[in-house]
Structures are given as C-alpha cells and as structure tokens.
From Swiss-Prot:
It comes from Psychromonas ingrahamii (strain DSM 17664 / CCUG 51855 / 37). One of its GO terms (cellular component) is cytoplasm. One of its GO terms (biological process) is ribosomal small subunit biogenesis. Keywords: Chaperone, Cytoplasm, Ribosome biogenesis, rRNA processing. This is Ribosome maturation factor RimM.
Length: 175
C-alpha cells in the first residue's frame, strides 16, 4: 500500500455480556465475522493504541460476543464498553477493481462537463445511500461553500479514478 499504514476503525465494543467479562462486539466489516481474523486488532484508550487479544468469540443473537484476555470479570470489561476496534490499514485486503470509502477523501470532484465542484472532505452515511461532502473551491462561480452529492453509482457517480484522485459526476454545479 502506498500510504503509510494508519489505524482504521472496523468495529467497536458494545455492552458487557454476563459476569465473566464477555463483551458484545459490533463489526463494521463486509463479512462481520472477519473482524476476528485481523491481527493485531487494536483499541484506542486514553489516546493510546493498545493491542486487543481475543481469547474466544461466538455468535450471540444478531451479533457477537468476545472474551478479551486480561478482562475476566464484568467490572473490568466495563472499561472497554464503547471503545473502537481498529486495524492498521495495510492489513486490509487490496481491492483489485474497487476502493474503500476512505480512498475517496481528498478526491477532486468534477461534473461530466468538466466543472470543478471541489474536494471530498467526508462521507455521510444516510439510510438510503451514502453522501459525498464536497468542499467547494473558494472561487466557485455559483457561490457554493459545500455540496452534498449522493453516491449513486452510474446515476450520479459517472466514474471514480482512485489513482488520479478524481470523481466524475452527473451533477448540476448550481445545485
């Protein structure tokens, strides 16, 4: 991977489960079980990254619970509730003809007609589709400071070129 590896959030700890220190785990990965395959798994506590050693995990209801090494009672595990689970970005699989949402941050966005709409600063998750937040250029002819562009493949998003950091959209610049 060309970028320096940086920790990427792939899940978080939920509520404590039982009295022996088990925790609910919310996975953000495409295949939810794959969160347990990443090594090392990290958590950020008090501004510091620490390795998470999972002794065991199992399916529970619609999710998972995990037993973390060194957290043997409910009260100890309570300190982990809400902490994010991360993995170094270089541990993520390379995508041949696809990309991660994080790869879109910093991409230039242009209309199919070549108008420069600005740069992607973040991606918002909505119920129906994700939305690109595009910071407009300071000299935007339409006076826009920011644009919200739905990420709808083929209908709004014409092309994504991660190598060139360019997203081409079917979008009116004055909208």
């Amino acid at each position: 991977m060309s970028k320096k590896a940086e920790p990427i959030v792939i899940g978080k700890f939920g509520a404590v489960h039982g009295i022996k220190g088990w925790l609910k785990v919310h996975s953000y990965t495409d295949d939810p079980e794959s969160i347990f395959e990443y090594k090392p798994l990290l958590m950020k506590s008090k501004g510091q990254f620490q390795e998470v050693n999972i002794a065991d995990w199992k399916r529970h209801s619609n999710g998972f619970v995990a037993k973390i090494v060194g957290f043997d009672v409910r009260e100890e595990a309570q300190a982990l509730v809400g902490l994010e689970l991360l993995v170094d970005s270089d541990k993520l699989p390379n995508l041949e003809e696809d990309f991660y949402w994080r790869d879109l941050i910093g991409c230039q966005v242009k209309t199919d007609n070549g108008y420069d709409l600005g740069v992607v600063t973040e991606i918002m998750e909505t119920g129906s589709n994700d939305v690109l937040v595009v910071k407009a250029n300071s000299n935007d002819a339409f006076g826009q400071k920011e644009r919200l562009i739905p990420f709808i493949d083929k209908q709004v998003i014409s092309n994504v070129d991660i190598t060139s950091k360019l997203i081409q959209v079917n979008w009116e610049p004055d909208f």
